[in-house]
């Protein structure tokens, strides 16, 4: 019973973090009374950064409390950094390949990327750095990997579910799924490997 309650709390936490992740996007894309995108019209980089930092702080505090970052320092070991590069480089290459194939054959639109580009276009460079380098990675790690690995007791099932869920949330039912899948598999495998180290230590 306690185990079910703990898993339920993790699901609620993941949904809450998912909600928080949409707040900066909603703020930037809010249409004012002139029906202009509020962020694009007003270049709200400072406000975006303040909202983003608050959300990052909340996410980190909740993550620490729920054990999301246990043993996270191991990711920064040289062998793990090399592994990350080995995985990310071919993943990016596959992303580009699938993207070109899908665009050439008119199989789908990357609506998620278009939305991100719209948001990033309304921010100055330091706002873009916050969004890309801190806000997105921290929230995605918590929502799509740390939470799921706490919900499923079997790490292999967690790996598959996490990879597919992350990909689907970014692509929906479309060929664009193939674009996000390689990167999703790569970053999930990095987290999966760290989780296995934790379990075996």
Swiss-Prot record:
Transmembrane as UniProt keyword: yes
Subcellular location: Cell membrane
Transmembrane segments: 10-30, 44-64, 82-102, 119-139, 159-179
Entry annotated with the keyword Secreted: no
Topology in membrane: Multi-pass membrane protein
Keyword vocabulary terms for this entry: Cell membrane, Membrane, Transmembrane, Transmembrane helix
GO cellular component, one term: plasma membrane
A Gene Ontology biological process term: CAAX-box protein maturation
GO molecular function, one term: endopeptidase activity
Family in the record: Belongs to the UPF0177 family.
Protein name: UPF0177 protein YajF
Organism: Lactococcus lactis subsp. lactis (strain IL1403) (Streptococcus lactis)
Designated gene of the protein: yajF
